């Protein structure tokens, strides 16, 4: 049978898709995953169920019986994705979603065996993290001290006040991203109570709502202190009345920052100083890890500060450390 690859499941089909909603509810309740992650699981599994439906010649998703799926069906699904030009990394992610679904069915006694037990995840090349150089990072923050940037703070009126507020906020945002290695979602979710400027640390809520303590360097402490002072003066009416005051970083209207704003902000400030193709908030997280390891920090400590659940993830950054060690060796060793 020819598979209709363009058709998406309709809402009423999704609602009746067998065992999908119990699994998604389990993700939210037991594993504390984010809504964005739940949406990704939903999309991956609906694509899987839709393929099985078409493959079996069924007329609706609710007719798909996960317990009757065989290893060959899963491998056909992987081949179908490859045929569509889906990249191996994306296929591995979709396969991980399907494996999690069947693990849930096994644990809840809905099935007695999983067809995924004999399916091997495609081998992936490790992606080397992109980062800005230490000199580029210095130039990034030097721009805030330049006469050109300070000129934007001059003048009277509301527009000048907004520029001043946003300039101090932007510097604090970038100092925290680079100085603490936070994810974008973690930065946006920071509460005022999570910041301790006296002792110099942040309490960060990461993936799976796991909390960790991250040290604040002096540049980040100073940037936050100045930002909080400007913020107090800018919002003449206490933010407590707006319902938004608990967030550390807000817009000039007192609302919580949103991802696109921080992405645009990061690109705007990095473009003049960095030759890196990527100019997003995550590259500052990569730079934090790379520069920490280059400076001699141990892998376990960096892993804890990044909120990684496994050292394997952090090991991706060691390629830069080895490059740096080779550079030092070549310069220092007489026989190099």
UniProtKB/Swiss-Prot annotation:
GO terms for molecular function: DNA binding; tyrosine-based site-specific recombinase activity. Its main location: cytoplasm. It comes from the Bacteria. The active site is at 183, 207, 282, 285, 308, 317 (o-(3'-phospho-dna)-tyrosine intermediate). InterPro entries: CB (IPR044068), DNA_brk_join_enz (IPR011010), Integrase-like_cat_sf (IPR013762), Integrase_catalytic (IPR002104), Integrase_recombinase_N (IPR010998), Integrase_SAM-like_N (IPR004107), Tyrosine_recombinase_XerC/XerD (IPR023009), Tyrosine_recombinase_XerCD (IPR050090). Residues 127-330 form the Tyr recombinase domain. GO terms for biological process: cell division; chromosome segregation; DNA transposition. Keywords: Cell cycle, Cell division, Chromosome partition, Cytoplasm, DNA integration, DNA recombination, DNA-binding. Residues 14-106 form the Core-binding (CB) domain. It is found in: Cytoplasm. Transmembrane segments: none annotated. GO terms for cellular component: cytoplasm. Pfam families: Phage_int_SAM_1, Phage_integrase. HAMAP family: Recomb_XerC_XerD. Belongs to the 'phage' integrase family. XerC subfamily. Forms a cyclic heterotetrameric complex composed of two molecules of XerC and two molecules of XerD. Site-specific tyrosine recombinase, which acts by catalyzing the cutting and rejoining of the recombining DNA molecules. The XerC-XerD complex is essential to convert dimers of the bacterial chromosome into monomers to permit their segregation at cell division. It also contributes to the segregational stability of plasmids. This is Tyrosine recombinase XerC. It comes from Chlorobaculum parvum (strain DSM 263 / NCIMB 8327).
């Amino acid at each position: 049978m020819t598979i209709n690859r363009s058709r998406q499941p309709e809402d009423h089909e999704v609602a009746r898709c067998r065992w999908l909603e119990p699994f998604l509810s389990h993700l939210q309740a037991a594993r504390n995953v984010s809504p964005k992650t739940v949406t990704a699981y939903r999309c991956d599994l609906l694509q899987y169920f839709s393929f099985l439906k078409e493959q079996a010649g069924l007329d609706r998703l609710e007719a798909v019986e996960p317990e009757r799926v065989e290893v060959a069906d899963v491998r056909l699904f992987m081949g179908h994705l490859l045929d569509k030009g889906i990249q191996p990394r994306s296929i591995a992610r979709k396969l991980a979603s399907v494996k999690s679904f069947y693990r849930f069915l096994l644990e809840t006694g809905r099935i007695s065996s999983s067809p995924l037990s004999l399916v091997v995840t495609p081998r992936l090349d490790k992606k080397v993290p992109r980062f800005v150089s230490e000199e580029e990072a210095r130039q990034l923050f030097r721009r805030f001290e330049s006469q050109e940037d300070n000129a934007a703070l001059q003048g009277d009126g509301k527009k000048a006040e907004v520029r001043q507020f946003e300039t101090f906020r932007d510097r604090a945002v970038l100092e925290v991203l680079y100085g603490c290695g936070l994810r974008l979602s973690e930065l946006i979710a920071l509460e005022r109570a999570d910041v301790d400027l006296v002792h110099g640390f942040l309490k960060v809520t990461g993936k799976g709502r796991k909390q960790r303590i991250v040290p604040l360097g002096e540049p980040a402490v100073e940037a936050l202190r100045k930002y909080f002072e400007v913020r107090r003066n800018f919002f003449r009416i206490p933010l407590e009345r707006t319902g938004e005051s608990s967030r550390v970083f807000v817009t000039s209207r007192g609302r919580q920052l949103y991802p696109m704003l921080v992405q645009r902000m990061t690109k705007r400030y990095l473009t003049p100083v960095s030759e890196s193709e990527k100019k997003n908030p995550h590259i500052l997280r990569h730079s934090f890890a790379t520069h920490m390891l280059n400076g001699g920090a141990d892998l376990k400590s960096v892993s804890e500060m990044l909120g990684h659940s496994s050292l394997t993830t952090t090991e991706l950054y060691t390629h830069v450390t080895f490059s740096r060690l080779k550079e030092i060796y070549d310069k220092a060793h007489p026989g190099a």
